[in-house]
């Protein structure tokens, strides 16, 4: 991941944690969609007001089966959620900041991305136990960064004719999940 992306992510974290952390409730989360894609992930929702929470999550997939088949992906997400009822229950809308670095290859097809994305999202928290919730969510936004797509995407720009480098802004899904949420407090 480039140094610029790391610095911007640290700034986002510092701004997000500037809010009052006298949380009444904290919840640990894992995204079952990413788990199904064999991408380990963990997150935390911190309630900062009666109907507001901040969320942080990360996922990492370091898998390389061969030179032709691999998935190397690292994603960090920080977000703010406004709950229409009590925090961690029922409907919410939110904003997300995402930092992603991925390198995927499946046979002759592959791509490498590094981007920062900002987006809006919606979700609903279903209570399935005393301290357990199931939260389907979706978010869309814009990504700012660079991509390399093509057969030999690992070859540096200028050294390989089959790699196509693009820079700019593109629409992305910033959050897609079926999250299992365990409320600690």
Enumerate the language-model features and the residues they cover.
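Short N-terminal segments immediately surrounding and downstream of signal-peptide cleavage
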Residues: 25-39
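Short secondary-structure boundary/capping segments within folded domains
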Residues: 34, 45-48, 170
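Gram-negative (and chloroplast) outer-membrane scaffold detector with strong preference
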Residues: 46-136, 182
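Extracellular/periplasm-exposed beta-strand and loop segments of Gram-negative cell-envelope proteins
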Residues: 31, 58-71, 101-115, 144-154, ...
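Short, surface-exposed coil-to-beta transition loops
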Residues: 38-41, 119
């Amino acid at each position: 991941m480039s140094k610029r992306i790391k610095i911007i992510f640290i700034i986002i974290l510092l701004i997000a944690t500037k809010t009052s952390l006298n949380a009444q409730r904290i919840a640990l989360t894992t995204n079952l969609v990413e788990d199904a894609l064999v991408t380990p992930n963990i997150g935390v929702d911190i309630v900062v007001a009666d109907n507001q929470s901040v969320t942080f999550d990360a996922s990492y997939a370091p898998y390389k089966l061969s030179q032709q088949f691999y998935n190397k992906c690292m994603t960090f997400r920080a977000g703010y959620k406004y709950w229409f009822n009590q925090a961690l229950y029922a409907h919410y809308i939110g904003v997300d900041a995402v930092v992603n670095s991925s390198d995927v290859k499946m046979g002759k097809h592959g791509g490498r991305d590094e981007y920062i994305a900002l987006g809006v999202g919606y979700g609903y928290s279903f209570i399935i136990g005393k301290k357990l919730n199931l939260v389907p969510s979706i978010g869309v936004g814009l990504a700012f960064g660079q991509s390399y797509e093509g057969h030999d995407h690992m070859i540096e720009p200028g050294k390989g004719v089959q790699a196509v480098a693009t820079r700019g802004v593109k629409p992305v899904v910033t959050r897609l999940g079926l999250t299992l949420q365990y409320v600690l407090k």
